[in-house]
Amino acid sequence: MEESNPAPTSCASKGKHSKVSDLISHFEGGSVLSSYTDVQKDSTMNLNIPQTPRQHGLTSTTPQKLPSHKSPQKQEKDSDQNQGQHGCLANGVAAAQSQMECETEKEAALSPETDTQTAAASPDAHVLNGVRNETTTDSASSVTNSHDENACDSSCRTQGTDLGLPSKEGEPVIEAELQERENGLSTEGLNPLDQHHEVKETNEQKLHKIATELLLTERAYVSRLNLLDQVFYCKLLEEANRGSFPAEMVNKIFSNISSINAFHSKFLLPELEKRMQEWETTPRIGDILQKLAPFLKMYGEYVKGFDNAVELVKNMTERVPQFKSVTEEIQKQKICGSLTLQHHMLEPIQRIPRYEMLLKDYLKKLSPDAPDWNDAKKSLEIISTAASHSNSAIRKMENLKKLLEIYEMLGEEEDIVNPSNELIKEGQILKLAARNTSAQERYLFLFNNMLLYCVPRFSLVGSKFTVRTRVGIDGMKIVETHNEEYPHTFQVSGKERTLELQASSEQDKEEWIKALQESIDAFHQRHETFRNAIAKENDIPLEVSTAELGKRAPRWIRDNEVTMCMKCKESFNALTRRRHHCRACGHVVCWKCSDYKAQLEYDGGRLNKVCKDCYQIMSGFAESEEKKRRGILEIESAEVSGNSEVCSFLQYMEKSKPWQKIWCVIPKQDPLVLYMYGAPQDVRAQATIPLLGYIVDDMPKSADLPHSFKLTQSKSVHSFAADSEELKQKWLKIILLAVTGETPDGPSEHLDTLDNLPGPKEKSEC
C-alpha cells in the first residue's frame, strides 16, 4: 500500500524547514556526523557495499547543479511501490521503516539533489528482479553532464530504438549494456568513490557485447527489409495493378526481397533474441550463423540482378511519371530517413559484409578451445565467400553514385550514367594552346571507355563543367613529350582530337600517363581485335601518318614554335602573312598554302581547311611538282632536334647587331655544324656555322650577357648566351670537341684533314 508523502516544499518555507532540520540534528546528538563517519569507513572497506538511502543522502558535501528531474515525492512514491511488491527489499538489503526514515524523507524534501545522488549511487537499484526501474534510471541519468546526455541520445539512435519494433522481454538490459559500451560509462561509475577505479573488460564481456551488437543491427536490418518489402514493393505493385506500368518491372526491381525478409524476420532475428536471453547458460552465436549458410543463395540471386535493378529504377523514374510519384511520396516519409529507393536497395548487399566483420571480431576474442570456435569458424568461411560478391556489388553501387554526381556536374547533358562506365581518374590539368603561349585550365574525367575533356564554368554551388571533347579510348595513343619551356607535358592522341596537356608536377604527369595507358591496355584486352594496336612509345609518331590523314585528329603545332610557313617556307608577319593550321596534319602554314578543303573522317565527314600536300594525298592526286633537292638550310628543325647532341634556345648576336633569341641545334648526323632556327618547328634554318677551326672564348666581358661565349674565326665573330651556367657548359662540351674535328662518340673522319689546317687545336685551347 502506498504511504502518504509530504506535500512539496514551497520556496517561502525553506527557512522554516531548515530550522526544523537543525533542531532534529541537535537532539539526535551528532547522529549526522556519526553517519557520515560510518559511510567513510564502509566505503573504505568495501566500495561495492550497497548503501542505505539515509547514508547516501548525507555523503554529498558539495551541492551540484543538476538537470531537471522528477520531484523527490514522485521518486519516494515509486520506491515505496517497489518495496511493497518485493517485501520492502531494495538492492538486496531490507529497508527499515522507522522514525529515522521519516526524518530522511524530510531532508530529501528540503534537498532534492541528495535524493537524486542517492539513486545515482546505487548501481543495483537500476534493475529489480531483472526488470529495469525506469524512475531510478531517469534519476541516475540526470547526474551525467550534458556531453554524456548527447552521447547517450546518439547511442540510442544508433541502436535503432525508433525502428518501430515491438519490445521484447530483457531488451532494456541489452540496450543498456550496448549504451554503456559506446559511451564508455557504467552504472557503477556514477559513484564518486568508484571514479578512480577502472575495471578491465574480460574476453567474456567483449564477446557478449559483439553478440549484442549483432542483435541490435539485425533489428535495424529487419526494419529496412520491411520498408523495402512491405512499403516500396507493395505500393508500387498496387500502382502497377492499376495499369500504370507492368507489374513484371516491379518484380525485377525487388527480385526475391520478400524471401530474404521472411527469413530474417521469422527465423534469424527470433533466434538471436532467444539466444541473448539465454546468454548466461549458452554464450555462443556460431551455431546460429552457421544455419544462415543455406540461405545465402537467396543473396546470390539478389546480387546477380542488382545492377539491372538499379538501372531499371533509373529508367522507370525518368520515363514513367506514376512510378516516380509513388517512390518520391514514400521517400518523403520519416521512415525513409531522406534516402532514395536505390540506397535502401543496397541494404541487403551491405548486410553480408557486416556479418563477416562481426564474426572476424568475434573469433579474435574467442578462445580456440571454446565450444563455439568450430561453428564460428565454419560460419566465417561460408559468409566470407558471399561477402566477396556483395563487396563487388557495393563497389558498383558506389561507382554509380559517383557517376550521378558527375552527371550533375556536367549539367545533366552527358549520358554517362551507365553501370558499364567506370570512373578511373579525374583532376585538373593545363592545356597548351596552339594559338598562343598560354596554358589554359581544364578538367579531365577518365573512364574505362572514354576521356571527357572539360572546361570549368562559373557556378555558385559546387563545381560545374562543360564537356568540350569526348575522346574514345579506342585508338587512343599516349606520348610523353619533352619541352624545355613547358615541363611535365604529354600528348593524348585520339580519333576525335589530339591534346597536348601539362601536369602540375612530374608525379602528376606520371600518374596520368599510367592511368591512361592502363585504361588503353584494359580496353584492348576486352576487345581482342585490337590486341596489336598498342605500339611501343618509341614507335608512336608525333605526327599523323600519311595513311591516317583525316582519320585521326592531329596535334597542332603551336604558333610560337615556327617563324615561317612549314610548306612554302615564307616568313610570317602580322599583316600580310598570318598563321593557319592544317586540320589534317596540324602544320602551321600561310594562307596561300591552306587554301584547300577536304572531308575529314574524324570530324564526321565535314569539310575542313587543309594544306596543299594533305589535299593532294587525300584526293589521290599525284604531286604536281617534283620535290627539289633540299639544301643544307632546308633541313627541318624538328627533324634534327629529335636526334641531336644538344639543342636549346640561345641568345645570339653577330657583330654589332642586337641580341635575338634563336633555336640552336647540333645534330648527331652532322655533329660539326651548328644549325640556327627562328623556332623549334621551323622547316628551314636561318643560318649554319661549320664549327671546325673556330676559336672558343668562354670568358665574357663585362658588357656581354651572363653565361655567354664567343666563336671566332678570322673576321667572323658569333656571340652566344645561355640561360644558365649549366646550359652553357653543356654547349661548350660539344662545341670544344667540334672545333677540333672530334665528336662525342669518338674521333671524326675529318681528323685526317686537321694536319693541313693552321693549328686549330692550339688556337682553340682556352
Curated annotation (Swiss-Prot):
What positions does the domain PH occupy?
A: 422-521, 643-740
Q: In which tissues is it expressed?
A: Detected in brain, lung, liver, skeletal muscle, kidney, testis and cultured hippocampal neurons.
Keywords (alphabetical) are: Actin-binding, Cell projection, Cytoplasm, Cytoskeleton, Guanine-nucleotide releasing factor, Metal-binding, Phosphoprotein, Repeat, Zinc, Zinc-finger
Stretch list, region Disordered:
43-167, 745-766
Q: Per the UniProt entry, what are the Gene Ontology biological process annotations, in alphabetical order?
A: cytoskeleton organization; filopodium assembly; lamellipodium assembly; microspike assembly; positive regulation of JNK cascade; positive regulation of JUN kinase activity; regulation of cell shape
Identify a single GO molecular function assigned to this protein.
guanyl-nucleotide exchange factor activity
Binding residues annotated for Zn(2+) 2, in chain numbering: 582, 585, 611, 614
Where does the record place it?
Cytoplasm, Cytoskeleton; Cell projection, Filopodium
The residues the record assigns to binding Zn(2+) 1 are 565, 568, 590, 593
**Looking at the record's lineage, which domain of life comes first?**
Eukaryota
ZnF bounds (FYVE-type): 559-619
Read off the InterPro entries from this record: DBL_dom_sf, DH_dom, FDG4_N_PH, FGD1-4_PH2, FYVE_RhoGEF_PH, PH-like_dom_sf, PH_domain, Znf_FYVE
Q: Where are the compositionally biased (Polar residues) regions?
A: 43-65, 132-145, 152-161
Q: Name one Pfam family in it.
A: RhoGEF
Q: Which residues cross the membrane?
A: none
Residues annotated as region Actin filament-binding? Answer: 1-150
Q: Where is the DH domain?
A: 206-393
One CC-aspect GO term: lamellipodium
- Subunit note: Homooligomer.
Q: What is known of its domains?
A: The part of the protein spanning the actin filament-binding domain together with the DH domain and the first PH domain is necessary and sufficient for microspike formation. Activation of MAPK8 requires the presence of all domains with the exception of the actin filament-binding domain.
Function text: Activates CDC42, a member of the Ras-like family of Rho- and Rac proteins, by exchanging bound GDP for free GTP. Plays a role in regulating the actin cytoskeleton and cell shape. Activates MAPK8.
Q: What protein am I looking at?
A: FYVE, RhoGEF and PH domain-containing protein 4
Native organism is Rattus norvegicus
